[in-house]
Structure formats: structure tokens, C-alpha cells
Amino acid sequence: MRQSWRPELLIVGAVVVIEGLQAAQRACGQRGPGPPEPQEGNTLPGEWPWQASVRRQGVHICSGSLVADTWVLTAAHCFEKMATAELSSWSVVLGSLKQEGQSPGAEEVGVAALQLPKAYNHYSQGSDLALLQLTHPTVQTTLCLPQPTYHFPFGASCWATGWDQNTSDVSRTLRNLRLRLISRPTCNCLYNRLHQRLLSNPARPGMLCGGAQPGEQGPCQGDSGGPVMCREPDGHWVQVGIISFTSKCAQEDTPVLLTDMAVHSSWLQAHVHEAAFLVQAPGVVKMSDENSCVACGSLRSAGPQAGALSQWPWDARLKHHGKLACGGALVSEVVVLTAAHCFIGRQTLEEWSVGLGAGPEEWGLKQLILHGAYTHPEGGYDVAFLLLAQPVTLGPGLRPLCLPYADHHLPDGEHGWVLGLTQKAGINYPQTVPVTVLGPMACSRQHAAPGGTGIPILPGMVCTTVVGEPPHCEGLSGAPLVHEIRGTWFLVGLHSFGDTCQSSAKPAVFAALSAYEDWISNLDWQVYFAEEPEPEAETGSCLVNSSQPASC
């Protein structure tokens, strides 16, 4: 695997080595013989003295790293469904450059005990780390670990090792792999651009990622459990992550998922007292990859304020013959969603233009698709799909909203935001209006004429009522109904009928976007669907040895 990135020196600040007991008294993270900087290609003998091959009955299963003279750190998923009595069949080979067999000078040590976090259930859920206690100490150099407050150099180049996948030789050799360290939000953003639900938001709390070099292959099968390492200015190498999983072999746009060492540092310190943990000196400049991938549903500001003029980066303003006719929402670089009723009797594309975000630029339309079942707003299916004539460039001022999947949860009483129109100096401006979701039966009753029955609120509809004092505004057809879940904003509705600005009048009724997942997906234009973000999880631990069951 040829590597093409230029090496970048990683400078993140001064480091103090907090020494533990015996193992940490010698220098951790000191790379072996070789050039001052690692080189892409085959690993040199002794270059990474802490590199471990974790084997079962002599066969390589996973990689690992020596973090104390009797402890090896690896991935928990390497030991799934393992019976306690099988510990004797496992061993660790240190100093070998061959995946099978041993290089000259390599050392093989047995495994006495295995520790797993309590929180570990499956590698995709996080907490994918394990500690192997060796049967006797080794003299190999150990790898440094980070303190919980360690700031990772996101966007910078770090290193991993992987077993060469481009050879048919059974005994694969160890190679150096340069990886770009990627934060969890950016990693999820990259995976969500693949538009595959099974791959959406894979980076859970307690994870980070590593991206391969452009056009090159990163860690692969057999590399699980191996360390991802960053170099400090004083020469210490610190393990920032454990290779956990990836989609096929890691590529630039499908990063490898890593177990975050800083998040799990307290757990490690509680179990490996001899390891050396690094703490960074005050004043370290944080490195960020925040702008390297524009995620759907992300806001750089604090969020909307009631009555404020809209500055949302996904707002769409649909103009017919130059006059504002409807609202809408940007859901990808080329797609805007709005209400179908906006185009009844006026479907000539050249008559329309679309403004986006807060900027003055306008886009033409290349294609217009109305839902085939639409007849009138009260009958449902009031959704239109607009394909822009030219793609937009996403950035701080232009970001798409996330679309909900069919099982997206939007309970009655949920808070959200809609847009109305307010006039200032004779000019219409979109105004943010806080709302709550109203149940279908209550919504139907409020739409009833005096003494009559209400209109049916169909399953593909959602109603809202204004929170607090009704604002001075008018409704805008096709305007988005949005709500936020743990920092991610979703497009949950498009205004169809009713009044978005008046709580005492008929409630606003929206086309519920979760009901249109299949219709939107079948149009075969990529848009940004997203899973609901999960809450943060805590980590714990348990010991697996001769006295406790492997399922602990």
C-alpha cells in the first residue's frame, strides 16, 4: 500500500509523564531504531516495540499494544463468546513483524486474565477495549496512554500499524499506516454522506476515527485491537485509540472507528496502575476538524429565538416570477423539499427561482416532482421534490437539514420551530415561531366548523400549535417544521394548511416527512437521512478470570 501524504509534524504542547510504579519508571512511548519520522511501508524491526499479536492456539486474531510490563491493551470484540476455560489457549507475541509465526527476537507470553468493561455489549455500541494480563513480565518498551483531559489533535496525521492486505502470502508483514485523526461528529458526517442507513452515525460516544490517505487503504481485517498513536514534541508516542471496526477496509471517506483512550482513561488507570499516563501542560492549543465535513442538521449558533428573523442555513425561499411564493428546506447539495400545492397551475420551471440561507444568490430548477397521490392539501401527500439546476457549496451559511427515517419519534407535546412571514418596511422576512406538536384528534376538532365535524388528520400529517403569545406573522406554505435532538436538527414537516402563527385559529398542519422515507429514497437522488443521536453512555468494568463467568 503506497502512501502519498507528506508527513506533518504533530505539535500539541508540552507533556508531563505521570509515572506509575515499576513499569512506568522506564520511558514509555519511545520508538525503536529507524529514521526520525516513521515511513510509509514495511515496519522496521523494533520500530514499535509495544506492538502485539494476540493469538489463539497460535493463530493471529487481533493486534494489541503493551501498556505495562504485564498488560496488553486490545479490543473487546476479539473475545466475544469466549469461554473462561479457553484463556490457556491464548497468547501474546511481542516484537514480531509477521502475522503468522515469529520474527527473530520475538517473545511469546501466555495470558493469565482478561478484563472487559461492563458497558461492552457489541463493538458497534462502543467500549470496545480489553486488557490482557500476561503470565509473566516482559522487558519490551511500553506505549504511553492519555489522561482523561488529553486534547486530541483532530485533523493532524497520526500512525497505526496494519498487516499487509495486498499479498497472497499467508505470513503477512506489518506495515506503517498514516491516519488522519478524525473527531466523532466529523466521522459521522463522512459516513452519513454514503446515504446508507446501516452505516449512519457509527461513531458512538467514547469513539473517534482515523481516515486513510487519499486513494489508499487503511486498517483492515486482522488489525482490530491495534493502537493508533500520535507523537508528542518531546518524542513520546501516546496511544489515542484502539482500532475497532470499519466498513470493509478503511478509506478516506470510510474512516476506521477507534475506541477513544481519553474517555476510557479512568477505567484503565483503575486496572493498570503500572502504566504511564500523559497529561498535557496548560495552554495547549486545541486542533479541530470542525469544518472538514458539513453535517446535516448542524447549527453553529445557539439555535433559534422566538420572533427572530430567520438565519437558518437550510431555509429555502421559492419565488415565482420573482415574488416570494413558498418556503422549503435544503436537504442535500441539490435537493429542496416543499409543499406540492405551491405548484398547482404553475409548473413551468423557468418561472421559479430558489434563494437559500441568508445569502442573496438564487438557483434555478432542473426538475420538479410532485407526489403522485396529491390532489389537495386536506387529502395529504402535500410534498414536492425540487432538483436545483446547480449544486450548492455547503459551508457555515448553507447546511442541509437531516431527514427523519420512518421510525423517527415525534411525540405529542414535542417542541419545534416553524417559519412565518413578518413585514418590515414593506418587505417580507421569515420569522421563527416556537410550537408544540398537537395530537391528531385535538387538531381535527379545532379544524371543525361550528356544529360540524373536524377534518380527518391523516397518518402522514402532523399538527402544531403556537407556544406563548401568538406572533405578528403570516403562515408560509411549504415552510419547514424542525425539531432538535441532542444538537441535530431534523426536518419533520412541511407546512400544508392551517395557520402557523395563530394559536387561537386553526392549527397548522404539516406533511410529516417520516411518512415519506420510501418515496424520497425511491427518487434516487441522495439526501441526508439521519438516525436520532443517542445519549452519552458511561463505562464500567468487570474481570474475566477463573472465578468469574465470561459474560460478566
From Swiss-Prot:
Its main location: secreted. It is an enzyme of class 3 (hydrolase). Residues 1-23 form the signal peptide. Residues 27-46 are annotated as: Disordered. Its EC number is 3.4.21.-. GO terms for biological process: proteolysis. It comes from the Eukaryota. GO terms for cellular component: extracellular region. Keywords: Disulfide bond, Hydrolase, Protease, Repeat, Secreted, Serine protease, Signal. The active site is at residues 77, 128, 224, 341, 382, 477. It holds the Pfam family Trypsin. It is found in: Secreted. Disulfide bonds join 62-78, 158-230, 187-209, 220-249, 326-342, 443-463, 473-501. GO terms for molecular function: serine-type endopeptidase activity. Residues 24-273, 294-525 form the Peptidase S1 domain. Belongs to the peptidase S1 family. This is Serine protease 53. It comes from Mus musculus (Mouse). The gene is Prss53.
